[in-house]
Every structure is written in structure tokens, then in C-alpha cells.
């Protein structure tokens, strides 16, 4: 989920959370990418060892009768084991808990060494100290969230995202999958804090680059074979948010646009690391992305890196932390630090490369005195720095209680409120926004007729390398 630049509509980082981000094992195991290819990793090792043991035992058998008896016993034992074994394959639609698919631990993301790593920068004593800080729960939660993201997006790519599909159906299919695989439906107060959606599913078409989701009261939109669709959704487990996005185009006309943005994102990942300057990362990303061009209807369009939306760090329960990672040349002094989590994302456009809030999509009368439904607003986020103690409007007080009990600082949308059974909340929401208690996100668009693309991954900055936690076989 892109962070709007300049500063605006960002969740205020909770400084107390940042200390919880601990560096991981400096020597991680090799990466296991993808979802289906990794599904069987958690359950097959014991069966193989049993077969080997049985083969050795069989080699010492002296009579055929004994051999027959032992084979029968082995067969009965094997059947009993199979009967009690949990499913080792995901269903379609995805409904099998990932915790049951990976009882021995979740797949590690793609592990990438830092560029030009100075091994003398960290002493042996520091390495021993850092290894003691390794937070296994932190890693397990992040890897579980990443596996949920991989499996749900694979289902979306294979079954949901097709010409003629309703964007509401796609969004709800993704979100139902995330909730089912995490084991938390989020319908009871506090349940949404345990696991579930990190933010609403973004489904942005063509010149709409970011922050659009289908909402109640709006006319449903159907996917056309000529569309370029950005799919951006987050999964969290215990507040550890995995933020990852991809773009789908059915027409090969846009292949270069998608390739440019995907390569730009991978360039950002390659340059990211401990002590890396965001200014240098942005310059490298822009150079790669703007080396591409796209021919549309006989006219050549250079791919432009979008200037006023950025990547960002991620804090616990806060999708946008205090650091931004632009994907253009810049003079920001910020550096990445060990133990931090970043969403490395890039957006490319065939248009101007500058986004603006679309009042047409958001409705110009959203905040009029008529208090019309906010049909086009993407989502809302609780500003945890502002108290609601002085609220006088009862509808605003009740709505704030619902927000605090179910979402906290996680971004939510109107669909999520209505899923909880909340009604007649528009006046209360308006009051919360006017008092700075809730912030809102509008759709961000480039010029009409242009096309935009997005790719994004979440990375963890370990001591000995970065883990691209959301990497899969697809991107």
C-alpha cells in the first residue's frame, strides 16, 4: 500500500513498537519460494524416514511367513497414519488453515546478501549479541502472513481475476481467503487484531494507481480484457503486516510497462539494506524504470516513475511507518537500519507520472453538509495520537468504539464496517474526520487515458542479509 508523498494520510508510528523488531538468524536457510511448491514441505519428511527404516528391517527378514506378517502390520500402520494426517494441500477457494499445512514451521522468504557487504563492519561479539536478540515469534508471524498472501494471491490469479469478473467479487474472494487461512474472521471484538487483513484490498484500473476498493452503494465495476489491474493487499498476523502487490494485464501491449515496474521493484530490493540511503535506492529505481517505453495504438510512451507516492517502512499494526522510500532521485537523508521492515514498491505510468486525488471517484460532496455516503473513499485509519474523549456526538462515540475494538490503527473500509453490522455511520465518520481522530485515503490517479502498474514486496533487514518475505514463484 503506497505511502502518499508529500506527508499525508499516514498512520502515526507507535514508537514503542519499533523496538520489537529484532534481527533474525544471520545465517538463514535457503529460500523456499511459492505456495503450492512449498505446501508439502511440512509433512513428508517423517514418512520418508519411516520407509527407510522399514526397508532396513525388511532386509533382515529370514522367512516368507514372517515377512508377510510384518508387511501386513506395516500396511495397517501406514493406513492409520494417513487417516490422522492433516490436509497437505490447499483447497480452492482457499479454506485450509496454513498452520495445518506447515506444522513444522513456515517457508523462509528469499534470502539475499547485502550488496558490497563489509564483513568487518560487524564483529564476532556483535554477531553473538544479535543472534541472542533473534525473535522467533516475530519471524514465524511474518512468514505465516507471507504464506497466506502467496496462497491467496495464487488463487486470485488462477480463479478470480478474469475478464468479465466483478471487482467486488475479486476483493471479497481475496479477503475471505485471508480470513479463512489465518483462522480469524474478525467478527468479534479483538479477533481482527490476532490475524487477518492488513488493509483493504486495492483494485486499481488503468490510470487509477492506488487507493481504490469497491464499496457499498457504488456501481459495481467489471474487469475488461483491455484493463491494467493493480492488486494490492496486506495480511497480518499479530500485527506483523506483509504488504505485497502485483499487476495483471491481459493485453500484451502493456508487457513492457509491467516489466519496467517489476524490474524497478527488484532493483529497489537489490539496493536495499542496512545503512542503505533511500536517496540512492530511489535513483537506481528510476534509472531502471525509465529505460523502458510502451507502444500503444502506434504511439510510443516512455514509462515514468511516479513521483508523489513512495515505498515505506512498516511498524506493528501500522502499515505506514516514519520512513519513506521514493522511487525517483531525491535528497532524503534517511538510511535503512538493521531490524527494520520495508515495503519496497514502485509505480510506473505512461502518463505524467504525478498522481492527484480524484474527486470524481471520491465524490465532491463527500464532506458536504448533506453527509452523502463516501462511496469513493478507499479507506480510513485511526489517528492514535488524537483522543476521542471530548466527542459529543453519540454516533461518533459509538463508531469510534467500534473502530478501536475491531481495527485499532489498521486501515479499514466501509465494507468492513458493514460486515460488522454497523449502520448509519456517515455522520459519525464525518465528525471523527473533522476532529482529526480518523484520516481517510482517496483514490490516486494519473491523467485520463494513461496506464499505471505496481509491484511490491515486503523485506526484513536481518543482520546477515535481507529476507524478501513475500517473494513467490509468481513475482
Swiss-Prot record:
Compartments where found: Cytoplasm
Extent of Basic residues compositional bias: 70-83
EC number, as in UniProt: 3.4.11.18
GO terms classed as biological process: proteolysis
Basic and acidic residues bias (residue ranges): 1-12
Gene Ontology molecular-function annotations: initiator methionyl aminopeptidase activity; metal ion binding; metalloaminopeptidase activity
Binding note for cofactor: Binds 2 divalent metal cations per subunit. Has a high-affinity and a low affinity metal-binding site. The true nature of the physiological cofactor is under debate. The enzyme is active with cobalt, zinc, manganese or divalent iron ions. Most likely, methionine aminopeptidases function as mononuclear Fe(2+)-metalloproteases under physiological conditions, and the catalytically relevant metal-binding site has been assigned to the histidine-containing high-affinity site.
Alphabetized InterPro entries for the sequence: Creatinase/aminopeptidase-like, Met_Aminopeptidase_Type2, Pept_M24, Pept_M24_MAP, Pept_M24A_MAP2, Pept_M24A_MAP2_BS, WH-like_DNA-bd_sf, WH_DNA-bd_sf
Residues bound to substrate: 211, 320
Cofactor(s) the protein needs: Co(2+); Zn(2+); Mn(2+); Fe(2+)
Alphabetical list of Pfam families matching this protein: Peptidase_M24
Primary localization: cytoplasm
EC top class named in words: hydrolase
Residue ranges with Acidic residues bias: 44-57
Residues noted as binding a divalent metal cation 2 in the record, renumbered to the chain: 243, 312, 345, 456
Annotated a divalent metal cation 1 binding sites: 232, 243, 456
PANTHER family the record matches: METHIONINE AMINOPEPTIDASE 2 (PTHR45777), METHIONINE AMINOPEPTIDASE 2-2 (PTHR45777:SF1)
Primary role: Cotranslationally removes the N-terminal methionine from nascent proteins. The N-terminal methionine is often cleaved when the second residue in the primary sequence is small and uncharged (Met-Ala-, Cys, Gly, Pro, Ser, Thr, or Val).
Entry's family note: Belongs to the peptidase M24A family. Methionine aminopeptidase eukaryotic type 2 subfamily.
Protein's recorded name: Methionine aminopeptidase 2-1
Species for this entry: Aspergillus niger (strain ATCC MYA-4892 / CBS 513.88 / FGSC A1513)
Amino acid at each position: 500500500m503506497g505511502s502518499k508523498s508529500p506527508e499525508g494520510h499516514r498512520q502515526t508510528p507507535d514508537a514503542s513498537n519499533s523496538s520489537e523488531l529484532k534481527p533474525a538468524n544471520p545465517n538463514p536457510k535457503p529460500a523456499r519460494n511459492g505456495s503450492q511448491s512449498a505446501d508439502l514441505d511440512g509433512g513428508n519428511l517423517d514418512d520418508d524416514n519411516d520407509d527407510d527404516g522399514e526397508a532396513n528391517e525388511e532386509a533382515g527378514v529370514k522367512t516368507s511367513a514372517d515377512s508377510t506378517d510384518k508387511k501386513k502390520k506395516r500396511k495397517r500402520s501406514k493406513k492409520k497414519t494417513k487417516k490422522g494426517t492433516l490436509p497437505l494441500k490447499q483447497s480452492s477457494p482457499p479454506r485450509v488453515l496454513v498452520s495445518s499445512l506447515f506444522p513444522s514451521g513456515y517457508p523462509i522468504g528469499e534470502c539475499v546478501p547485502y550488496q558490497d557487504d563489509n564483513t568487518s563492519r560487524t564483529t564476532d561479539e556483535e554477531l553473538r549479541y544479535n543472534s541472542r536478540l533473534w525473535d522467533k515469534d516475530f519471524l514465524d508471524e511474518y512468514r505465516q502472513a507471507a504464506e497466506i498472501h502467496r496462497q491467496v494471491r495464487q488463487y486470485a490469479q488462477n480463479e478470480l481475476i478474469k475478464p468479465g469478473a466483478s471487482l467486488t467479487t475479486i476483493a471479497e474472494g481475496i479477503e475471505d481467503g485471508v480470513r479463512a487461512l489465518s483462522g480469524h474472521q474478525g467478527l468479534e471484538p479483538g479477533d481482527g487484531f490476532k490475524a487477518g487483513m492488513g488493509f483493504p484490498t486495492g483494485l486499481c484500473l488503468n490510470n487509477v494507481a492506488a487507493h481504490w476498493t469497491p464499496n457499498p452503494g457504488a456501481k459495481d465495476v467489471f474487469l475488461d480484457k483491455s484493463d491494467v489491474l493493480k492488486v494490492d493487499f496486506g495480511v497480518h498476523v499479530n500485527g506483523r503486516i506483509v504488504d505485497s502487490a502485483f499487476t495483471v494485464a491481459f493485453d500484451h501491449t502493456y508487457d513492457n510497462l509491467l516489466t519496467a515496474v517489476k524490474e524497478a521493484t527488484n532493483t529497489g530490493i537489490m539496493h536495499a539494506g542496512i545503512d542503505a540511503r533511500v536517496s540512492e535506492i530511489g535513483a537506481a529505481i528510476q534509472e531502471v524504470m525509465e529505460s523502458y517505453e510502451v507502444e500503444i495504438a502506434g504511439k510510443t510512451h516512455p514509462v515514468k516513475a511516479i513521483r508523489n507516492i513512495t515505498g515505506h517502512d512498516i511498524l506493528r499494526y501500522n502499515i505506514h511507518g516514519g520512513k519513506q522510500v521514493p522511487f525517483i532521485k531525491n535528497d532524503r537523508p534517511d538510511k535503512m537500519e538493521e531490524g527494520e521492515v520495508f515495503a519496497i514498491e514502485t509505480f510506473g505510468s505512461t502518463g505524467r507520472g504525478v498522481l492527484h486525488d480524484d474527486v470524481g471517484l471520491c465524490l465532491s460532496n463527500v464532506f458536504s453538509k448533506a453527509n452523502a455516503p463516501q462511496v469513493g473513499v478507499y479507506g480510513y485509519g485511526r489517528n492514535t495520537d488524537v483522543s476521542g474523549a471530548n466527542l459529543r456526538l453519540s454516533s461518533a462515540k459509538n463508531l469510534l468504539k467500534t473502530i478501536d475494538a475491531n481495527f485499532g490503527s489498521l486501515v479499514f473500509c466501509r465494507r468492513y464496517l458493514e460486515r460488522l453490522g454497523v449502520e448509519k455511520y456517515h455522520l459519525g465518520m464525518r465528525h471523527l474526520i473533522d476532529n482529526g481522530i480518523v484520516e481517510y485515503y482517496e483514490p490516486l490517479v494519473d491523467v485520463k487515458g494513461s496506464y499505471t502498474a505496481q509491484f511490491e514486496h515486503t523485506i526484513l533487514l536481518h543482520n546477515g542479509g535481507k529476507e524478501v518475505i513475500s517473494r513467490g514463484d509468481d513475482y
